[in-house]
């Protein structure tokens, strides 16, 4: 084995020279230079400074403007709530531990940080699944004049939390475990060991199949069908130009969210899968640290995409920030096409 396993940790560094110490008790400066830990802390500080205001503003603006409280926006707000969980439950912890060079909060703090990070990531993934299904049902119309209403949105939000908890909670109750990863300053699922005492192998397989592969299959299926439907509708001119443009803009926004999710999380998932399927292989702490910390940037991109691509929300946000006046002078009529709500279109 090229790493050192302890009772509740796995350090990707051989203890042949006797330098490895528990990441819960001692600085891990034998893994990297102190300045590298400081860089991680600076990165986490940046994510907090950007992540909290933009996600909080997303929630606040929606509460202030009734016109934004559409069913589809419930799912988008769910993403903002999940991001805030990551900011407060994970980022603040990782910032503090990076400044100290080890996970100072012990195994209990590791469980909390790992739980919030996993919960936030899974809520985001399952929210994208719900959005993909919504786009498929509304645009492809397999159920005729189906309209995505408030009850559907509430059920969708509840579904994302149930599925996310089904992934994030088991390690807290003895099925798998959360341990420090990479430079030992943040925590995640144990991909490093089989750990039969906690049935770790079965949990990791369950996680990759149920909470990553299946959601990806659903998302790609929905958007694959959607592309064909949009092409047919365009060729036959079955819907009004305004309706087509509105549906196209919403669909494009959600697709960009999916692409951004893949960019942030696929490197982490790929490295985790490699580590799990190559037990005992030789890899350094940076190998997992970079994708793990890069994945944390996911807390920023969803609200940024939403603000950039939804003109109505952008106008409402500027009005809120500027105390009731929009400096751009855009009226609501110009934003009608960009409203993030589903239209009820006659079936093909």
Swiss-Prot record:
**Residues at which Zn(2+) binds:** 201, 279
MF (Gene Ontology): 11-cis retinal binding; G protein-coupled photoreceptor activity; metal ion binding
**Which GO BP terms, alphabetically?**
absorption of visible light; G protein-coupled opsin signaling pathway; G protein-coupled receptor signaling pathway; visual perception
Transmembrane region positions? Answer: 37-61, 74-96, 111-133, 153-173, 203-224, 253-274, 287-308
Q: Which residues carry this modification: Phosphoserine?
A: 334, 338, 343
Residue numbers bearing the N6-(retinylidene)lysine modification: 296
Q: Which residues lie on this side of the membrane: Cytoplasmic?
A: 62-73, 134-152, 225-252, 309-348
* Chain positions of motif 'Ionic lock' involved in activated form stabilization: 134-136
Assign the protein's first listed, main location to one coarse class.
membrane
Q: Which GO terms describe its cellular component?
A: membrane; photoreceptor disc membrane; photoreceptor inner segment membrane; photoreceptor outer segment membrane; plasma membrane
| Site location (Plays an important role in the conformation switch to the active conformation) | 113
Post-translational modification, briefly? Phosphorylated on some or all of the serine and threonine residues present in the C-terminal region. Contains one covalently linked retinal chromophore. Upon light absorption, the covalently bound 11-cis-retinal is converted to all-trans-retinal. After hydrolysis of the Schiff base and release of the covalently bound all-trans-retinal, active rhodopsin is regenerated by binding of a fresh molecule of 11-cis-retinal.
Q: Which residues carry this modification: Phosphothreonine?
A: 336, 340, 342
Q: Which cysteines are joined by disulfide bonds?
A: 110-187
Per its database record, what is this protein's job?
Photoreceptor required for image-forming vision at low light intensity. Required for photoreceptor cell viability after birth. Light-induced isomerization of 11-cis to all-trans retinal triggers a conformational change that activates signaling via G-proteins. Subsequent receptor phosphorylation mediates displacement of the bound G-protein alpha subunit by the arrestin SAG and terminates signaling.
Task: Indicate what this protein is called per its UniProt record.
Answer: Rhodopsin
Q: Which organism is it from?
A: Macaca fascicularis
């Amino acid at each position: 084995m090229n790493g050192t396993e302890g009772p509740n940790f796995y350090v990707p560094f051989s203890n042949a020279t006797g330098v490895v110490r528990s990441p819960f008790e001692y600085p891990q400066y034998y893994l990297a230079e102190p300045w590298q830990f400081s860089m991680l802390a600076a990165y986490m500080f940046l994510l907090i400074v950007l992540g909290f205001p933009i996600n909080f503003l997303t929630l606040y603006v929606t509460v202030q403007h009734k016109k934004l409280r559409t069913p589809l926006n419930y799912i988008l707000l769910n993403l903002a709530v999940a991001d805030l969980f990551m900011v407060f439950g994970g980022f603040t912890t990782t910032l503090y531990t990076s400044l100290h060079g080890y996970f100072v909060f012990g195994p209990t703090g590791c469980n909390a940080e790992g739980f919030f990070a996993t919960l936030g990531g899974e809520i985001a993934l399952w929210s994208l699944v719900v959005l993909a299904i919504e786009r498929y049902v509304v645009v492809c119309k397999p159920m005729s004049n189906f309209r995505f209403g408030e009850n559907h949105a509430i059920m969708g939000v509840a579904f994302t939390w149930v599925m996310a908890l089904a992934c994030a909670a088991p390690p807290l109750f003895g099925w798998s475990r959360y341990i420090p990863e990479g430079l030992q300053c943040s925590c995640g699922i144990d991909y490093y060991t089989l750990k039969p005492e906690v049935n770790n192998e079965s949990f990791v397989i369950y996680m990759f199949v149920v909470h990553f592969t299946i959601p990806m299959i659903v998302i790609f299926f929905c958007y694959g069908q959607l592309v064909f439907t949009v092409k047919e509708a365009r060729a036959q001119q079955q819907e009004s130009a305004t309706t087509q443009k509105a549906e196209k803009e919403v669909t494009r926004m959600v697709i960009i969210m999916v692409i951004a999710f893949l960019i942030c999380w696929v490197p982490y998932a790929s490295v985790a899968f490699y580590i799990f399927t190559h037990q005992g292989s030789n890899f350094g702490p940076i190998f997992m640290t970079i994708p793990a910390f890069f994945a944390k940037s996911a807390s920023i991109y969803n609200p940024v995409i939403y603000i950039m691509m939804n003109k109505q929300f952008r106008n409402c946000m500027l009005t809120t920030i500027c105390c009731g006046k929009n400096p751009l002078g855009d009226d609501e009529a110009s934003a009608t096409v960009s409203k993030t709500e589903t239209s009820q279109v006659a079936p093909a």
